[in-house]
C-alpha cells in the first residue's frame, strides 16, 4: 500500500439525485418532499435559453421560501462555454439563501474549468460574507473530461462529487447510440450464435470511481433515459453500485425509490458484513490473519470490504 493514505469521501448520503428544471417552480415543493438525498435544480439542458434568467430567479426565490428539510440542495449551472454560467454563479450566491449547498458544473473537460468556478465562488463568498462553504460537483460528459478525469478530481478542495453524463459523453466519443445509459442494442459479443451484451459505460465509470476514490470524492452514476423501464434502471444502478458508485440521478420521480433501494445495503448484506467483521475479530484474537466464513476465505481486506457496507448502512440508518 502507498504511504499516501486514501482520503475518505464526504460522509453524506448521495443515493439519489433528483433533477428538476429551474423553469418549473411548481414542482419544487414536491421535489423537497421526495425521498431523494440530493435535489438538483437545473439551469442547463432542461431550460430553454430565453427562460434561463427567470429560472435563475425561481431557484433563488425557492432557496429562501421552500423548506428543503435535510436535502442536499444543488444547482446545475450552465456550461463554461456559454454566456450564462458566470451570471448563474453570481446571482445564486449573491441573492440566494445560505440553504444552497452545492453548485454542479456540467461538461467539465479539464482542471481549469473547476478552477474558474472555484475562484468566482471564493470571491463571492468573501465579498458577501457567506457562512456556508459551497461545495462543487462536476459532470464528466466528454472525451476530454474522461481523459483528464484524475486532474479534475484533484482540482479543488470544494469538490465533493463527480457524475457521468452519458448522453453528452456518448456524443463526444462518437458512439453509435441515441440511448442514455443502459445496455445498447449493438454492443455485444457473438459466441456460438448467442449474443452476450456488454456495458459500454463500464470503462468510463471505472475511471471515474478510481479518480474519485483516490481524491476522496463521491462517484455518482448519471441518468437512465427510459423512465418507463424500471428493470433497466435497476440493472444499470446495480452495475454502478458494484463498481463503487454511491448513487444515481433520477430524471423522473418514480426513479427515486429505485435508486434508494439499490444504493441502500440490504438487511442481508449488512448482516453478512457484520458477521464477517465478527469472524475476523475472533480470528485476530486467536492470532490468525484470516479465517473461513461460509466456506470462503476472509482476511484483512475482507474487513475493509465489510466496513464499506456497514458505513453505508449506518448513514442510511438501516
Swiss-Prot record:
One BP term from GO: oxaloacetate metabolic process
**Catalytic activity entry:** (S)-malyl-CoA = glyoxylate + acetyl-CoA; (2R,3S)-beta-methylmalyl-CoA = propanoyl-CoA + glyoxylate
Please give one Gene Ontology molecular function term for this protein. Answer: malyl-CoA lyase activity
What InterPro entries does the record tag this protein with?
A: Aldolase/citrate-lyase_domain (IPR005000), Citrate_lyase_beta/mcl1/mcl2 (IPR011206), Pyrv/PenolPyrv_kinase-like_dom (IPR015813), Pyrv_kinase-like_dom_sf (IPR040442)
Which superkingdom heads the taxonomic lineage of this protein's source? Bacteria
Please provide the record's keywords in A-Z order.
Lyase, Magnesium, Manganese, Metal-binding
Report the top EC class in one word: lyase
Gene3D superfamilies from the xrefs? Answer: Phosphoenolpyruvate-binding domains
Cite the EC number.
4.1.3.24
Q: How might one describe the regulation of this protein's activity? A: In vitro inhibited by EDTA.
Cross-referenced SUPFAM superfamilies, in alphabetical order? Answer: Phosphoenolpyruvate/pyruvate domain (SSF51621)
What is the recorded function of this protein according to its Swiss-Prot or TrEMBL entry? Involved in the ethylmalonyl-CoA pathway for acetate assimilation. Catalyzes the reversible condensation of glyoxylate and acetyl-CoA to L-malyl-CoA and the reversible condensation of glyoxylate and propionyl-CoA to beta-methylmalyl-CoA.
The similarity comment for this entry is: Belongs to the HpcH/HpaI aldolase family.
Specify the protein name. Answer: L-malyl-CoA/beta-methylmalyl-CoA lyase
Source organism: Rhodobacter capsulatus
Amino acid at each position: 500500500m502507498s504511504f499516501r493514505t486514501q482520503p475518505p469521501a464526504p460522509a453524506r448520503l448521495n443515493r439519489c439525485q433528483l433533477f428538476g428544471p429551474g423553469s418549473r417552480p411548481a414542482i419544487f415543493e414536491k421535489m423537497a418532499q421526495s425521498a431523494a438525498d440530493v435535489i438538483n435544480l437545473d439551469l442547463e439542458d432542461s431550460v430553454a435559453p430565453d427562460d434561463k434568467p427567470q429560472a435563475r430567479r425561481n431557484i433563488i426565490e425557492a432557496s429562501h421560501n421552500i423548506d428543503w428539510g435535510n436535502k442536499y440542495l444543488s444547482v446545475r449551472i450552465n456550461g463554461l462555454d456559454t454566456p450564462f454560467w458566470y451570471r448563474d454563479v453570481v446571482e445564486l450566491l449573491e441573492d440566494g439563501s445560505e440553504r444552497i449547498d452545492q453548485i454542479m458544473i456540467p461538461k467539465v473537460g479539464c482542471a481549469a474549468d473547476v478552477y474558474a468556478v472555484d475562484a468566482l465562488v471564493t470571491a463571492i463568498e468573501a465579498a458577501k460574507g457567506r457562512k456556508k462553504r459551497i461545495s462543487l460537483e462536476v459532470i464528466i460528459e466528454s472525451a476530454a473530461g474522461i481523459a483528464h478525469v484524475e486532474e479534475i478530481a484533484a482540482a479543488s478542495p470544494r469538490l465533493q462529487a463527480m457524475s457521468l453524463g452519458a448522453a453528452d459523453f456518448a456524443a463526444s466519443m462518437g458512439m453509435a447510440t441515441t440511448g442514455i445509459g443502459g445496455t445498447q442494442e449493438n454492443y455485444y459479443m457473438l459466441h456460438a450464435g448467442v449474443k452476450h451484451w456488454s456495458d459500454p459505460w463500464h470503462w468510463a465509470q471505472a475511471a471515474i470511481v478510481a479518480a474519485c476514490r483516490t481524491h476522496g470524492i463521491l462517484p455518482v452514476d448519471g441518468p437512465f433515459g427510459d423512465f418507463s423501464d424500471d428493470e433497466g434502471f435497476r440493472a444499470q444502478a446495480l452495475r454502478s453500485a458494484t463498481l463503487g458508485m454511491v448513487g444515481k440521478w433520477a430524471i423522473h420521480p418514480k426513479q427515486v425509490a429505485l435508486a434508494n433501494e439499490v444504493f441502500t445495503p440490504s438487511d442481508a448484506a449488512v448482516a453478512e458484513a457484520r458477521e464477517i467483521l465478527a469472524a475476523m475479530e475472533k480470528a485476530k484474537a486467536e492470532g490468525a490473519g484470516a479465517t473461513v466464513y461460509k466456506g470462503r476465505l476472509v482476511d484483512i481486506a475482507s474487513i475493509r470490504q465489510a466496513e464499506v457496507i456497514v458505513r453505508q448502512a449506518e448513514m442510511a440508518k438501516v
